[in-house]
Amino acid sequence: MTKPTPTIHSLRDLRRLTPARVGLGRSGASVPTKALLDFTLDHARARDAVHASFDGAALTGELSALGLAVHEVRSRVRGRHDYLVRPDLGRQLDPESRDRLAGIGGPGGDLVLVIGDGLSPGAVHARAAAVVGRLLKRLTEAGIAVGPAVVANGARVALGDEIGALLGARMVAVLIGERPGLSSPASLGAYLTYAPRPGLTDAERNCVSNIHPAGLSEDEAAFKIGWLIREALARRLSGVALKDDSMLEAATAARELSAPG
């Protein structure tokens, strides 16, 4: 899980390692035409990502194929404009969805997975099922009982707290499309909360972000998410009280494997 640190001697070396805007150059008092056109294109891609459609039924099928029991819900949002201007509604289940989950009852296991559209539905369709598949293998090896998965339309991160509480889960993991950036319009994020309940703050969650081809790979993301879930359940806490030392553990394991004898 560890990668060698690349050697950087110039801005050209740095530009090969990141899609960020580095060393653009200039043309008179402005940037070169190509840099301006690239910026305009990336801005358009980010806007398109926010307004992309979400196919909950297709995602439900992918998750069901992984052996999960899947429930579809929606927030109180009633359209994409509503979602953007009323983030509070994206944190609350609509009454019908709430009643349906409450009717399921019973313990939700150690973990409930919530997969929501967020601000980049395309990222969810491109990567969520692959991350979940890799994550399930790690959770099974760790003896962690995974409850049902919930596919949420019009979701903000905190919607997972209400879902986790209704299903009686010890912990909730929310996989959601992140706010598109100019270099990453399809990035997935994971938010992990121990003892979920409505009213929690961001300080009580752990986040694994930038899951996309130029950021964290699906394997790396599953490793980090699995480590945080395991430690959160063992220590009975999450958020600022839980430091992500997953890479330290990976480095230690790598050294042990490479040691002679």
Curated annotation (Swiss-Prot):
Q: Name one GO cellular component term.
A: ethanolamine degradation polyhedral organelle
Q: What class of enzyme is it?
A: lyase
User: What's the Enzyme Commission number for this chain?
Assistant: 4.3.1.7
Q: Could you tell me what reaction this enzyme catalyses?
A: ethanolamine = acetaldehyde + NH4(+)
Cofactor(s) named in the record:
adenosylcob(III)alamin
Q: What positions does the entry give for adenosylcob(III)alamin binding?
A: V157, E178, C207
What compartments host this protein? Bacterial microcompartment
What pathway, per the record?
A: Amine and polyamine degradation; ethanolamine degradation
GO BP terms in the entry: amino acid metabolic process; ethanolamine catabolic process
Keywords for this entry? Bacterial microcompartment, Cobalamin, Cobalt, Lyase
- Function in brief: Catalyzes the deamination of various vicinal amino-alcohols to oxo compounds. Allows this organism to utilize ethanolamine as the sole source of nitrogen and carbon in the presence of external vitamin B12.
Record-given protein name: Ethanolamine ammonia-lyase small subunit
Upper classification of the organism: Bacteria, Pseudomonadati, Pseudomonadota, Alphaproteobacteria, Hyphomicrobiales
